[in-house]
Amino acid sequence: MIVTRFAPSPTGYLHIGGLRTALFSYLWARKNGGKFLLRIEDTDKARNSQEAAEAIVKAFNWLGLEHDGEITYQSQRDDIYAIYVKQLLDEGKAYRCYMSREELDALRETQMANKERTKYDGKYRDFDGTPPDGVDSVIRIKAPLSGEIIVRDGVKGDVVFKAEDILDDFVIARADGSPTYNFVVAIDDHLMGVTEVIRGDDHLSNTPKQIVIYEALGFDVPKFYHVPMIHNSEGKKLSKRDGATDVMAYKEMGYTPAALLNFLVRLGWSNGDQEIFSMDEMRELFDPKNINRSASIYNTEKLDWLNSHYIKNTPNQELAKMLEEYNLTIASHDKKEILLDALKERAKTLKELALLVTEVINPPASYDEKALEKSLKGEAVEVLNNFIAKLSACKELHLPSEYHHVMQEVVDEMGIGFGKIGQPLRVALLGKMSGPGLDSVMAVIGIDETILRVKSALALVK
């Protein structure tokens, strides 16, 4: 069974690159009927944030990325890691190193002066004497000093590292007994039954060390897929301005889970020319072997386009529920179908849609002064007065077409073009010269509110 995992460090909030990795891991597990596990790598006590850890879980819940089983927290597993440190010591595959910080610094300076690679020199690798006084020991693993470490990668192919170029006897447990990052990653991937690791290629340099640990402990090495980074339009690392921000900020900006996940799955993976993917299609079609080897480009316009597509195609009842995030309660509004049908074609984000809804259902808080001056003068005043007179005579109007008919009557009787009524009426109803179809606006707010808004606007220009 394929088992994947997502293993963020809660030293900051979940960002877009991490979410893409999580999505790829989730899809591959679900496609194969496997498990998708969540592990919080919170061993860095100085930098970790409980708030950030909770935000990761919150983001998963918002996006519908269900993980299997309980969340694994590395900070709760020190006793487990200690067992494997002891095993390596007992088997002679690891040893205590007593070099002081001063000795290590001096060694590094000498190597740099000689233009050599900085590394631990193995001083205590085969030490069997009396330990020096007053120096706490770290635990180092006996890494291979020659030969090749081959990372069998599903994206990049076989990546070959020469041991002498990249390895030394690296630390697996600090002087205080706490285990190091690469050590706990290897232990947990084994104990959690992880068979395939999908992660950013910034982790590729860690992989040889993890393979050394797997092999020293007799563990199976998982399959790796190292995914190229996401770059901005200039081919540089994403900044917060480009989109490298907290995932939950996308919710606040008004992006839907479906759009964000669709956007992310196409960053570095494709299925022909297809752009729109439902979650079911993603689960069916995704294969990490089709991940591009080059970096993907973050494109805000593409995200906006996808988001507008999903807004247009979301059932109105569901949209109304989404808008509750913006303190809008329209689920029970008797004209919500007309309202949302008129507006959702105009919005790129839910936040924009919420603003458009507010502008329709509430009278204008202010008016565009230039629009008032340009549109509500001369003949326009007569046109609007004729319109509200006809509207007042109507007992019931419900549909946009019925309001349109009243407008058409005024146009026909006065022998004017439709723009002569449309522009001043729009300013009167919405306070500006742009907006959705007027017949839909009036169908939503009703006869009385329409008349009230027109009279209020006319009062401003008398």
UniProtKB/Swiss-Prot annotation:
Pfam families named among the record's database cross-references: Anticodon_2, tRNA-synt_1c
Keywords from the named record: Aminoacyl-tRNA synthetase, ATP-binding, Cytoplasm, Ligase, Nucleotide-binding, Protein biosynthesis
GO CC terms, sorted: cytosol
GO BP: any one term: glutamyl-tRNA aminoacylation
Motif 'HIGH' region, residue range(s) on this chain: 8-18
Reaction it catalyzes: tRNA(Glu) + L-glutamate + ATP = L-glutamyl-tRNA(Glu) + AMP + diphosphate
Family annotation (CDD domains): GluRS_core
EC code: 6.1.1.17
Motif 'KMSKS' region per UniProt: ranges: 237-241
Positions of transmembrane segments: none
InterPro entries from the UniProt entry: aa-tRNA-synth_I_cd-bd (IPR045462), aa-tRNA-synth_I_codon-bd_sub2 (IPR020751), aa-tRNA-synth_I_CS (IPR001412), aa_tRNA-synth_I_cd-bd_sf (IPR008925), Glu-tRNA-ligase_bac/mito (IPR004527), Glu/Gln-tRNA-synth (IPR000924), Glu/Gln-tRNA-synth_Ib_cat-dom (IPR020058), GluQ/Sye (IPR049940)
UniProt-annotated location(s): Cytoplasm
Gene Ontology MF terms: ATP binding; glutamate-tRNA ligase activity; tRNA binding; zinc ion binding
Subunit structure: Monomer.
Family: Belongs to the class-I aminoacyl-tRNA synthetase family. Glutamate--tRNA ligase type 1 subfamily.
NCBIfam families membership: gltX_bact
Biological role: Catalyzes the attachment of glutamate to tRNA(Glu) in a two-step reaction: glutamate is first activated by ATP to form Glu-AMP and then transferred to the acceptor end of tRNA(Glu).
The name this protein goes by in its record: Glutamate--tRNA ligase 1
Gene: gltX1
